[in-house]
Amino acid sequence: MSYITNNTISLSFKSLRLELILFLLLFSSCSSSVYLLDKKPHWVDQGYELHVNNLVKKANSKPNNPMHQINATKGLTIHSFGFAMENADRLIIDDYKSGKDLYASAHKSFAHAVIFGNKSLSLKYPGYIDWISGDSELIPNFNKDDIENLYWTAGAYGGAIKSSRGDPKWVILLPRIGRLLEAALSLDPNWNNGSLYVGMISYTMIRHDAPLDKELVATDFFNKAVETSKNLDASPYISLAENVCIPTQNKNEFTNLLYKALNIDMHAEPDLRLTNYINQKRAQWLLDNIDEFFY
């Protein structure tokens, strides 16, 4: 007797669809990922969430493996920023409660990402926890292989703080982002097309000990990021627009930066194609909702 029901068949096809999407996201060209994001964003969300769940399971099953820990951190952070936070930013304008609930959901994922990120580094460096918590000034002997761990752990902290919506117990941890990014910068400042410089744009503007000329410092990081990426990455433009132009209410520069981001050739650098697609979608959304940010 067969126990396959219509519901089982439906679930099987759904599972196969998600596995196919997951394959395209992870192993196919960026063009395939861009196409799916453009045409079927919900499918991509589901497919990547399945991938992240698998990464988290591996990290939990092998808690002493630094690679599994950082993979979980990276997966959770990418998914939470790329889907949950993006959707929350849009939703909260029209439906405050639903948007707030989505931020809370993203925050849980970021909090888990922070735990995995800290674990990935503490397994390699016993003094890491004392250093990151500020109890010790002795910087662990990081090397270039640790930059990815440092970067994604900083990203997880940034996401957790932003999605906490001002929760003091998370805001007080802001200096940890700086320690992680500055440690990575000391190893290879031009890593990954200037990603560390982009991270420093936002951190410079919100750090507790921000310099009086923080806008100029952030702009300097912006210029370095643009130079390092050969002006092929939209990320610096989005970051400067959101983190500097909105707080200073510089609407003209905000608009100028976002149009420059939109004019970047998404296909010029294959490694940046997916990132640029996501950032250009955000740039257009920011322009469409400009009155929400300037008064």
Residue ranges and their predicted role:
Residues 63, 125, 189-191, 230-231:
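Short coil turns that delineate tetratricopeptide repeat
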Residues 27-29:
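C-terminal motif of bacterial Sec signal peptides marking the signal peptidase cleavage site
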Residues 33-57, 61, 75-183, 196-228, ...:
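Short coil/linker segments at helix-helix boundaries
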Residues 289-291, 295:
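Eukaryotic intrinsically disordered, low-complexity segments enriched for acidic and Ser/Thr/Pro residues
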